[in-house]
Amino acid sequence: MKKGTVLNADISAVISRLGHTDTLVVCDAGLPVPRSSTRIDMALTQGVPSFMQVLEVVTTEMQVEAAVIAEEIKTHNPQLHATLLTHLEQLQQHQGNTIEIRYTSHEQFKKQTADSQAVIRSGECSPFANIILCAGVTF
């Protein structure tokens, strides 16, 4: 049995294949997943697992150098936005690097997901609970 944090075989595999600047999406239950993208569906029911639960596990094994977030989260989901920023700050400290945070419109965000290595769908049912993570290097 695998000893690492991520037990889900699909998530573990996609993280292990990421190269520098490759992207990975963690999203809520409502984000449309492009047909061209690999879909890893973790949603069991509304809210399970939450967006933050999935993100926290993914970032234990993924080196992150940048993140893209929809601008709309600031006004439509400020509590989750604050939680997300706190998590990214803690991740920066743990990794020992700066994580660049970029904001874009939700429409542009959806277009960018097509370029990601995979889209991991959570059971989150709150607005704009989505992030594109950009892989960094560990050296």
Swiss-Prot record:
Function of the protein: Catalyzes the interconversion of beta-pyran and beta-furan forms of D-ribose.
Gene Ontology molecular-function annotations: D-ribose pyranase activity; intramolecular lyase activity; monosaccharide binding
Active site location: H20 (proton donor)
Family in the record: Belongs to the RbsD / FucU family. RbsD subfamily.
Pfam families assigned: RbsD_FucU
Keyword Isomerase tagged: yes
GO biological processes: D-ribose catabolic process
A GO CC annotation given for this chain: cytosol
Record's subcellular location: Cytoplasm
Catalytic reaction list: beta-D-ribopyranose = beta-D-ribofuranose
The protein's name: D-ribose pyranase
